[in-house]
Amino acid sequence: MLTALLLAVIGLGDLARTHLRRRAALLAVPVLAAAAVTAALLVGAPPLGAAIVVVLAGAWLLTTTTVENARPPGGLRPAVALVAAVLVLTAVDRAAGVPTGPLAPTTVASTLPPIEQLALAVGAGLFLLESGNVIVRAALFRELPQAEPAPRPRWSERFARREPADARLPDLQGGRTIGPLERLLIAGLTLAGAIGLAGAVLAAKGIVRFPEISRDGGSGEKAEYFLVGSLVSWALALGCAGLVAIAGR
């Protein structure tokens, strides 16, 4: 349950600061986090664990940015720390056993999948939407040559849209929209056991992108952008699918 809560709070926070203005995002993020924590407590999440999750999610929001062409203030370090936190929380969730919260008995007794699996599927889906883009961009900024970084924004500015800073990330049309849809599709097909269809999606993406990449000339930046971004995006989708599958066992 704690893993699902962490992914959900981070996912909701990133969606809010991407699509809302600064003031609205500053109000929406704590409200959404409180709602997610309350729901988790009602189905049996330990209060101390929920408090730790809120701290971890806050650290993520303070060390990352959803601004498309702004250099991530924390680089890839927040993503690495998040992976470690997810592994630890997954182990804690597995050791905790069946949830015992006020809403757990009726939910567990239903014909639906286990509540832990349902919660993790929702949390992973929210995370893959915008937080996946955050990690992909952090990997691209690390791997591709960049201009001098812009001054580090104040923490409150990371919750809102800003004018893009000067950056040299190659532009592949529709990447910010296609990426989340692709991750959700791959994760869903993997969970459904349709590995062949998931592979077809990956192949189709390469075919569709080939004309745009081939016009890149001799620099090869778009090809590297496509390769690095795709591999990171696919790894996130498969990782989330694995977490959901494990939660059902």
Task: Describe each region flagged by the PLM.
Residues 21-28, 211-235:
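Interfacial loop-to-transmembrane junctions
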Residues 2-20:
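N-terminal signal-anchor/start-transfer transmembrane helix
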Residues 67-141:
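Long, highly hydrophobic alpha-helical transmembrane signal-anchor segments
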Residues 23-32, 50-52, 71-84:
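Cytoplasmic-side transmembrane-helix entry/capping segments in multi-pass membrane proteins
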Residues 1-8, 44-56, 195-202:
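Structural signature of hydrophobic alpha-helical transmembrane segments
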Residues 240-249:
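Juxtamembrane boundary at the C-terminal end of a transmembrane helix
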Residues 178-209:
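Alpha-helical transmembrane segments of helical membrane proteins, especially in multi-pass transport
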Residues 6, 46-55, 113-130, 190:
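Alpha-helical transmembrane segments
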